[in-house]
């Protein structure tokens, strides 16, 4: 287990591309951090700098109080799981799991015992003599994870380890990783482009875009109190609806539509009176029930553009002038009759 601090970390390539800008993050001992963002945002580059696979252009990487910028990857005592498993296909599962221990010149019997004990956590005991080519994708990923755990490193680094798995297996492996991390209490940094993985796995999430940190916080903090439009639009499925409107005293004007502002928000919006603002509405906060209408006395009558039936709920696309907004409605509403 280890604490990790990244101070003003930058990555600038020889061609001038600035991949990571002034990255600052303090990671507690045993914390599960997930870095998430669109492709090319700098999350994997940051992970590789922590691992020592990429040089740091400027800034300080502090591991347990020691500056490790120039320390070789093998001396950092961190273990990395890659998206493509990175297994040796000419070696058995047993030898793949134990390769890092063998490199450390540990004794043969202790190595075998460690492999056996760790493989039990991943249900791999019956596959130790097989070659990776004879395993399913999920089993190969478990071998890669097992190989990481058997090292007992100070930090786990995981670069999109579930992206090659199907949806059902991804969900199962996701919960296994979380359970294992809580059991081992090993500091973990996990990179993904999948916000569901981020929301369900992380103690804290780091959202990145274009090489910058956009916000750091718990899943609840990011969902309920996004710092900016990027975070608000990135977190949540379906995406948050953004509607341009004008503040007019105690009301919001969306072209010819008028929505009363809740008393609790009137003071907050007072400085914006007469100005254009962006109203953000989560799809699940749009409702069709009379009870909600009677409670708030605010409603819009909007035509349905189309809808998607998902069993327990509908994603309903509503037309608001030139915009399409999404409502997430319980399937007890028969929108096909609306």
Residue ranges and their predicted role:
Residues 59-67:
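Conserved ABC transporter NBD signature motif
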Residues 36-38:
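The feature captures the beta-strand-to-loop junction immediately N-terminal to the Walker
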Residues 51:
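Helix-to-loop junction immediately C-terminal to a conserved catalytic motif
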């Amino acid at each position: 287990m280890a604490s990790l601090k990244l101070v003003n970390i930058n990555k600038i390539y020889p061609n001038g591309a600035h991949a990571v800008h002034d990255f600052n993050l303090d990671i507690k001992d045993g914390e599960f951090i997930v870095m998430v963002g669109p492709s090319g945002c700098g999350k994997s580059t940051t992970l590789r700098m922590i691992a020592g696979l990429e040089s740091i252009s400027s800034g300080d990487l502090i591991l347990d109080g020691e500056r490790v910028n120039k320390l070789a990857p093998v001396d950092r005592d961190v273990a990395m799981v890659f998206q493509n498993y990175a297994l040796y296909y000419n070696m058995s599962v047993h030898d793949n799991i134990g390769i890092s221990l063998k490199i450390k010149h540990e004794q043969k019997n202790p190595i075998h015992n460690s492999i056996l004990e760790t493989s039990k956590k991943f249900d791999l005991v019956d596959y130790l003599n097989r070659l990776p080519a004879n395993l399913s994708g999920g089993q190969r990923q478990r071998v890669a994870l097992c190989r990481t755990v058997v090292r007992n490193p100070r930090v786990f680094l995981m670069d999109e380890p579930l992206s090659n798995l199907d949806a059902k297996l991804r969900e199962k492996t996701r919960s296994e990783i979380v359970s294992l991390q809580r059991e081992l209490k090993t500091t973990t940094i996990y990179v993904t482009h999948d916000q569901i993985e981020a929301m369900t796995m992380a103690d804290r999430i780091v959202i990145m875009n274009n090489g910058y940190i956009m916000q750091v916080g718990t899943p609840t903090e990011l969902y309920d109190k996004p710092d900016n439009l990027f975070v608000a639009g990135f977190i949540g499925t379906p995406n948050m609806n953004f509607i341009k409107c004008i503040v007019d005293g105690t009301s919001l004007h969306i072209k010819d539509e008028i929505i009363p502002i809740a008393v609790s928000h009137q003071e907050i919006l007072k400085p914006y009176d007469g100005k254009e603002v962006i109203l953000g509405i989560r799809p699940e906060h749009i409702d069709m029930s009379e009870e909600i209408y009677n409670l708030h006395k605010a409603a819009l009558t909007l035509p349905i553009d189309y809808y998607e039936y998902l069993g327990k709920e509908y994603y309903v696309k509503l037309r608001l002038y030139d915009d399409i907004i999404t409502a997430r409605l319980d399937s007890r509403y028969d929108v096909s009759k609306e």
